[in-house]
């Protein structure tokens, strides 16, 4: 029987998934959503935890922003299509620099896994900046902030129990996880950062659609609890923040990853 506090996904698959490929990612420390090593370590980097999602009072909740990059950064591509239309080809940084684009107009994504994060106002960084290029010159751009939620406490015992599972092995006894969710950080850090970044972006003549915020739906609902009723949806302009929220899809058989399901699409002036 599953505990009320439990780990849901580790290295992209169900925590208890005993299929061969899922267990190989445990050995490699690999993240299937960004195609490289997981960045969730213990304090001395001797253990790679790979924890993508965990239980919460609001249902299964994404706790690593890289989990939101499933299906080859589909959430980022969705922003590009909304901001610049679906006709302009989309390139990650390595794709753009690796060969000349076939189109005179294209979108290039710059971020932590595609080139580097872009600095904002000298002291802040934006997770992603999508740049619309025409004849290799910048004509417009939008910023994207991607957030999940930090955890408190620890899930060490539960994680090590799941780690004992091997390919094809029988189920093992899993202790309850001792994690909590750092909702206070939403109020103290995330909201002020979004306000500051939105203000900086609104001042640029090359920003015509403000910035975008990608976040798990339960985290956004917590924003609403803290801030009250959000303004009515508005058409996008340079002062606008557009919010896309996502939930994890239904649990899948072992060997398959869960889909991300779009939930909210809000836009209001920041």
PLM segments and residue spans:
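Short His-Asn-centered micro-motif
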Residues: 124, 131, 146-147, 213-218
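Intrinsically disordered, low-complexity regions enriched in small/polar residues
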Residues: 15, 95-98, 130, 143, ...
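Non-catalytic C-terminal interaction segments of nucleic acid-processing enzymes
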Residues: 1-35, 39-41, 166-270
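Extracellular-facing segments of soluble proteins and assemblies that are Gly/Ser/Thr-biased and enriched
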Residues: 102-141
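Active-site beta-strand-loop-beta-strand hairpin of nuclease catalytic cores
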Residues: 130-160, 169
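Low-complexity, serine/threonine/proline-enriched polar segments
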Residues: 99-116, 144, 174-181, 186, ...
